[in-house]
C-alpha cells in the first residue's frame, strides 16, 4: 500500500482498521490517550506489533512474574536478548530458547530455518560466540502425509541453516501426538560463551550518538509476523505465507563474525537483533531501556524492494539484521569493519533525550510516539482462569494397570513408538561435530560441549512431557524441570539455570489460562528447589487449529556445568561384569505413559507424581558419585519405564547386554513412568563405595551375551530380548514410518 493509499487517522478509527492489525477497541482508545490524538497508519502499526502478545506478553506477564530469576551465578536475567550465567574463570554461558511455531506450520522449511537464525542473533547480540544449538519439536502422528511433510521440512530447515552457519546442533527432542497435527511446535535454543567484560546490552545511551543499521537489506517478508504469531491458525492462515521470513545462513555467519569483532571496539554503545517486529521493536526497546529517544530517517534503510512505505519498513521481519548505537564521530570505523565482511552498515538516525521514537521519510515526520509507550506500556491483562473440566474427572479416576499379555512384544512395540524410537534420522542431518568441541553427541541424556582452553564442559538438554502437563499442569511443570536437571546430572553436569518456551493454546480461554498458571506454578517450585533460576525465555500462545489446542507444552532448556571433562558420563553400558543399580522406587504410575497411549490410544488419569526434595537429594548423590569416579554409565528413567531405559543403555553399547531382577508387579516394574529414577552401572570394585554414597538397589549386572533378560522376584523370566534385534527395531521405526 503506497503512502497515498493509506487510510487517514479518522478512517482508521471509524472503519476499525486497527482491529485488522490486532488491536482491541480498548487498546486503540489507550493509544489515542497516550498520543493525545488519533494515530496515523504507521503509528497504529507500531502499536499493533509492540502490543501483540508475542512482543508484550500482555496476557502472560502476571504469570511470568512467578518465576525465580535471580541466583548467585546469574549475571543477566530476563529482559535482554538472552540470559547469562557465570561459569567461573571470568567466563559465562549465554542461552535462550524461542519458538517459531506459526511460521513453521505454514512454511516449514523457512519457518524452522529462520527460527534458528533468530535465536542465534539473540545470543551473539549479547557479545557471545554461539557454540551449540538444540531444538525441541512436536508433531502430529507420522501416519499423516501432512505431518510427514512438516516433519521432513522442519528438520531440513534446521539442518540447512545450522550446518551452513557452522554451529553444531547437538541435542533436543522430538515428540509425536495427535494434538500437534495442525499446529506443530518448533522451539530452537542457542548456547554461547562470553568473557564477562564483553557483555553487551541492547540499550541506546548517549544523546547525539549514532543509530546504525547493519546486515541484510529490508524486504516485505515477515510484515506482521508478530501479530500472526498472536492468533490461532485457521484455514486462511495458508494465505499468510508472505508473513514467513526467508533466511540466509551465509549472511548470518558474516554478521556473527562482524558483530563479535565490533563488540571488541569501544565505539559500540548498544546492539540488538531485529527480531519480531523488526526495526520497531529494536529501536523502541533500545531507547526505552536506556530512558532515551531515537530519531530515524527511513530513506536510509537499505531496501531490496521498491516503493516500501514507512509502515512496511518498520514492520518487516527480514532476517539477518541488527540495530546498533555507536559513539558519534566513529561511524566510518564501523562502516569499514562491516565492509570487510561484505556487509552494509548505514547511519540512519541518532539518540535523543526526549524519550520519543520519531520517524522521518521523504522529508516528512511520519511517526512520533513515546518509546516507553511501545516497549513498556502495553496493557497487562489478568485473564480469567478456570480449572479444566477434564481435570477433576482424571483426578477421581481409579487407575488400573494396563493389561500386557507378552512383555517382550510390549517392549519391542514401545521401542518403536516414534517418541521413544531413535532420532538418528533427525540428527544425522545435523552437523553436530563442527567446531570440534562436541564431547557428547546427540542420543544420550544431555549433550556436552567443551569450553576450549579449560577442563570444563557445558551440558545441555531440552525437556517437556506435555502429556503429563495436560493431565496435571502443576505436577507436569515440576516434572519438566526435574527431568531436565536429571539429564544434566546423568551427563556429569551441575544444573545451572533454565530458559523456557511456553507453548499453549488461546489464553483468552479460561481453561487454557488455568493450564498456563498451574504449569508455571509447578515449574517455579521446581526451579526454586533445584536452584535453577529462569534467565529468559519466550511465550507462544494461540497454538490452536480450528479451535483445538495443543497440549500445554512449557519446554525447558537447561544448561549445566561439567567442572571437569573427566566427569562426563553417558547412558550406554561400558563393560561386562559392571553392576546395574536402580535409584528410586517404582509405583504403578501409567497416566500419560507411552504404554497407556499405545494400549488405549489415548491418555487419561493422574500423571506420575514427584517429590522435589527427594529428586534433589538423589540428583546430588548421583552427581557426587559421578564426580568421585564411581559411575560407569547413568541414564534417567523416562518414557517407557525401566525396561526401555535398560534396553537403551544396552542398545548404545556394542555387544553388551544385562541380566536384571525387578521386584513388584511385572507391568509396573517394566513400564511404569515413576519419576526421580536412574539406571546406573558401577565397576564391581566400586560396589562398597558407591552403596555408601548413594541410596540405590543393585538389580543385576552387565553381561557380554548381547541380550537383556529381566526376571521377577521369583526369578521367573519376564522377557529376554536380543540387543541387535532391539536396536534394529528402535533405529528403524521412524525411517519406516516415513517411507
Swiss-Prot record:
Per UniProt, Mg(2+) 1 binds at 98, 538
Give the residues annotated as active site: 54, 100
Q: Mind listing the GO biological process terms from this record?
A: 'de novo' IMP biosynthetic process
Q: Which Gene3D superfamilies match?
A: PurM-like C-terminal domain, PurM-like, N-terminal domain
- Kindly tell me the pathway this chain contributes to: Purine metabolism; IMP biosynthesis via de novo pathway; 5-amino-1-(5-phospho-D-ribosyl)imidazole from N(2)-formyl-N(1)-(5-phospho-D-ribosyl)glycinamide: step 1/2
What is the predominant subcellular site recorded for this chain? cytoplasm
Binding-site residues, ATP:
57, 96, 500, 537
**What subcellular locations does the record give?**
Cytoplasm
Superkingdom to which the source organism belongs: Bacteria
Q: Provide the binding site for Mg(2+) 2.
A: 122, 273
- Top-level EC class as recorded in UniProt: ligase
Kindly state one GO CC term assigned in the UniProt record.
cytoplasm
Pfam families named among the record's database cross-references:
AIRS, AIRS_C, FGAR-AT_linker
Under the heading CDD domains, the entry gives:
PurL_repeat1 (cd02203), PurL_repeat2 (cd02204)
Reaction(s) catalysed by this chain, per the record, are:
N(2)-formyl-N(1)-(5-phospho-beta-D-ribosyl)glycinamide + L-glutamine + ATP + H2O = 2-formamido-N(1)-(5-O-phospho-beta-D-ribosyl)acetamidine + L-glutamate + ADP + phosphate + H(+)
One GO term in the molecular function aspect is: ATP binding
Keywords attached to this Swiss-Prot or TrEMBL record, sorted alphabetically, are:
ATP-binding, Cytoplasm, Ligase, Magnesium, Metal-binding, Nucleotide-binding, Purine biosynthesis
Q: Where does substrate bind?
A: 99-102, 121, 245, 317-319, 540
EC id: 6.3.5.3
Q: How does it assemble?
A: Monomer. Part of the FGAM synthase complex composed of 1 PurL, 1 PurQ and 2 PurS subunits.
Q: Which family does it belong to?
A: Belongs to the FGAMS family.
Q: Which HAMAP family match?
A: PurL_2
Under which name does UniProt file this protein?
Answer: Phosphoribosylformylglycinamidine synthase subunit PurL
* Gene name as annotated: purL
